[in-house]
Amino acid sequence: MKMTKKKRTKVFLTLLVILIVLLAGIILTNSFGGRQETIQETMRDAVLHETGKISFLGIKDVNPAFLSAVTVTVVLLIAAALIRIFAVPKFTYIPGKFQMLLEQVVGLFDGLAKSNSPHRNGFLGAYVFAAGVYIFCGTLFELFGFQAVTTAGESIALPAPLSDINGAIALGCLSYCIILSGGIAGNGVRGIGKTLKDFSLPISMSFRLFGALLSGLLVTELVYYYIHLSFVLPVVVGVLFTLLHALIQTYVLTMLTALFYGEVSEPVRKKENAERQKKAA
């Protein structure tokens, strides 16, 4: 009984401390004076990036997402080089935890490429792996809350690279170029025609990425503005949206790229023979 009372007392005191901290946070995070951006201004800037520019190496003022893209790219390249130099030579027939994890990730994207493009998948597997890792890590990047100083002297949290429409369009167009190269490699000039037939593909890919990431940002901003508990619920909402978008958008873009690549790179003769066999059956 004594232990039970002690436990109850500890639980009660813990809850009381948490409640006091939350109340203090609510009071301290409320604005007293000074101008704050309205929700309309915040959401407009999230889409158009008219304000909040960052000086990039003193050369040019850029959107925060560009700096995020450069940071994520450099980190991934350094990580890839370190893994190749120090980890890969130590791989064994009986894999350790890190080797097993790496093999599972590589095998996932390699299997995706082979299942959707069985006739031509060497380069496709490498591309969907690189694109998938970039989308996943880039989406999770905003969770770290790295700060940068704008040209106006204000502090701003770096967003996900693909939350900028320019980054999303660049990745969508790059994926379309990869699909086009597969069509040329598989069917020559005829492959170009098959690929250009889906001219809206890069637009749909780009806006799918941008729209998904932007929706998470806007929902989080709405929660910040209209729910006063601005340091508890937005964290949960932001993490959930970010994790879901990282997984979903990685899968969607890599799947679409592999699917269309396999379609345009499939040799025409094999496709015609397969259709004849189906009709004969």
Predicted regions and their residues:
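Selective transmembrane helix interface/packing segments
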Residues: 2-281
